[in-house]
């Protein structure tokens, strides 16, 4: 179990790897005109909102949770991409506005694989405008994506039971028309308990 355990401890989680890849993809798509691309702090309290609106135009990414799939080795993860841009009296201020950023991210992220997760599929875009944001001179849009995410393989060699009988049939005949060119090998192995 040692090597497998160490592997799990030191490797980055699938969520963290996807988060880093998503940030890199957003920077590649529109890094020239964004002042900040970062991970969302995780809550919507006053200090978090002030942090998000301090440096527009900016994009923040958040993993919002997951739900089970029919495939027991994957889940469907939900991601939020929050776009922040300046406004003045309800009017867009900067040359690159929030609509252009949303359109660029929609075109660049929708139906794109962000490894190690699967394809990101846009679910909805919502205007998160509030009086608080208006007073701060910004508009915020939330873009919500679903992506199939693999679960880590938790199988360890130490958890596998010993097998006692190894049975294998070899087809040793190169001519597929030969009726019985097969050899069967059965080996009974001792186990640790024997």
From Swiss-Prot:
It comes from the Bacteria. Pfam families: Phage_Mu_Gp37. To phage Mu protein gp37. This is Mu-like prophage FluMu protein gp37. It comes from Haemophilus influenzae (strain ATCC 51907 / DSM 11121 / KW20 / Rd). The lineage of its organism: Bacteria, Pseudomonadati, Pseudomonadota, Gammaproteobacteria, Pasteurellales.
């Amino acid at each position: 179990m040692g090597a497998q355990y160490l592997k799990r401890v030191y490797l980055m989680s699938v969520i963290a790897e996807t988060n880093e890849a998503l940030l890199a993809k957003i920077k590649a798509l529109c890094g020239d005109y964004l002042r900040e691309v970062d991970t969302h702090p995780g809550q919507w309290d006053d200090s978090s909102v002030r942090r998000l609106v301090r440096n527009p135009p900016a994009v923040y990414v958040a993993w919002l949770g997951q739900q089970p799939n029919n495939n027991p080795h994957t889940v469907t993860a939900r991601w939020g991409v929050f776009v922040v841009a300046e406004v003045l009296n309800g009017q867009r201020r900067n040359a690159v506005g929030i609509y252009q950023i949303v359109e660029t991210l929609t075109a660049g992220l929708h139906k794109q694989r962000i490894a190690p997760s699967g394809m990101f599929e846009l679910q909805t875009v919502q205007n998160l405008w509030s009086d608080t944001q208006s007073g701060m001179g910004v508009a915020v849009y939330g873009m919500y994506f679903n992506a199939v995410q693999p679960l880590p393989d938790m199988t360890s060699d130490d958890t596998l039971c010993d097998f006692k009988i190894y049975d294998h049939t070899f087809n040793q005949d190169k001519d597929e028309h030969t009726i019985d060119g097969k050899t069967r090998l059965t080996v009974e192995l001792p186990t640790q308990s024997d």
